[in-house]
Amino acid sequence: MMQRCLRLQKPLALRRGLRLAQANSQAVATEAPEAEPLDAFERQYLKERIEISPFQRLFLGAGSSIAALLNPRRHDMIACLGETTGEDALWTILDTMQASEEGQRIMADKPRIHTSTIDFKYLETLPPDTFGAAYVKFLKDNQVTPDSRMAVRFLEDPKLAYLMTRYRECHDLIHTVLDMPTNMLGEVAVKWVEALNTGLPMCYGGAVFGAVRLRPKQRRAYLKHYLPWALENGKRTKPLMPVYWEKRWEQNIHELRSELGITVLNKA
């Protein structure tokens, strides 16, 4: 696990330097290089983005981590922590997206997951063994809504901002495909899978510190069943960010899990 973590977390300065060198090389190769046009999401994000200095980023990261540890229900602090600590991991995720056709389509389309963009009435008509039907059932059983995710504000690059947005909006879809509820045990288990799958520091933090808050009975179940299952799935599962979930509604959920390398925990 440590090797995977180290592999994912390349120094941010080095990554920025490599990208800058590539950009300079491309500029030399063409006399009049044209900037890549911004799409609707990127234009809107740049209007609403809050620019912060490196010191402010460090201060926000430290403050939000303490606040999130003291009160895990402070979703605003958890969101801030993700943005101020996750940039390097997001660059790695962007590379992963660009390495697959499905990921490239996501970055081109930039789909959003809201009640205004998903036809939930249609999903309710799907057979019960489809991914779409399972997603609707998950939302109803756990009384959650896809409209509750906080907007990204502190990332500099709009593409990274979309990836963080995508991660947040797909969180319930990950719960669905993993067959995990939104209780503390389920959240901690999902955070481990997400941490190993994405490399996002906030996921590691949520997994480690979330487990500390488990009650004794929950902790026994966590150590005996949930943690081994989560670590195994996190290491084995294919990258989840490049999955175009909205194109998979009609897919049999068991086939989808098999394709992604996911096994469901037997909670009996």
From Swiss-Prot:
One of its GO terms (biological process) is ubiquinone biosynthetic process. It is an enzyme of class 4 (lyase). It comes from the Eukaryota. It catalyses: a 4-hydroxy-3-methoxy-5-(all-trans-polyprenyl)benzoate + H(+) = a 2-methoxy-6-(all-trans-polyprenyl)phenol + CO2. GO terms for cellular component: extrinsic component of mitochondrial inner membrane; mitochondrial inner membrane; mitochondrion; ubiquinone biosynthesis complex. Its cofactor is Zn(2+). Its EC number is 4.1.1.130. Pathway: Cofactor biosynthesis; ubiquinone biosynthesis. This protein may be expected to contain an N-terminal transit peptide but none has been predicted. This is Ubiquinone biosynthesis protein COQ4 homolog, mitochondrial. The lineage of its organism: Eukaryota, Metazoa, Ecdysozoa, Arthropoda, Hexapoda. The gene is Coq4.
